[in-house]
Amino acid sequence: MVATYFKEYDHDASLEDKSTEAYQKVWNAAKAELAIRAILKAKGAKGFTTNFDDLGDIEYNGFDQIPGLASQRLMAEGYGFGAEGDWKSAALYRTVWVMNQGLPKGCSFLEDYTLNFDGANSSILQSHMLEVCPLIAANKPRLEVHFLGIGIRKSQTARLVFTLSLIHISEPTRP
């Protein structure tokens, strides 16, 4: 799985150095992804949630970070996702993903951070600190390892980093 990450995503060559903490974070992210995939397959589930309040025990199961990379990759495959146990967002994401099949780009789990009610210039700034689907990236995602800007800051987290493509919500996107 780690080799797949390095093949599919741009990354700094130093991430491939197995002696570094950053490589260990990528390795642990891969273990988390494989575990989540196994659970989803065993249950026949098409969506899931995570919660950063309970990641397990690093000494017991090796989960030392939020499984953001797994969430990003699984969303790209159509699995519904909701953060902090939000099963309704997971169900909505899966529904929208299925409806979007055959159309360019995709959809993502995001949160409305700022609303600007300004008539014809109204806009919404949407973001999320980690679990954003790479299908809406403007360019090829980059695999990086960093501390989160908010929330859990005890451990660095592997994730895909990218700039979103701009979507004009005032213009129709369907024929």
Where is each model-derived feature located?
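A charged, amphipathic alpha-helical module
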Residues: 1-61
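Structural motif
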Residues: 46-47, 79, 105-108
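A glycine-rich phosphate-binding loop feature that marks nucleotide/adenosyl-phosphate handling sites
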Residues: 50-57, 108-130
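A glycine-rich, aromatic-flanked flexible loop/lid motif
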Residues: 57-71, 135-137, 141-144
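Catalytic or ion-translocation cores adjacent to nucleophile or general acid/base/metal-coordination motifs
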Residues: 64-95
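Catalytic phosphate/nucleotide-handling subdomain of diverse soluble enzymes
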Residues: 84-119
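Active-site rim beta-loop-alpha module in soluble metabolic enzymes
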Residues: 127-165
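Residue-level detector of conserved catalytic or cofactor/ligand-binding positions
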Residues: 167-175
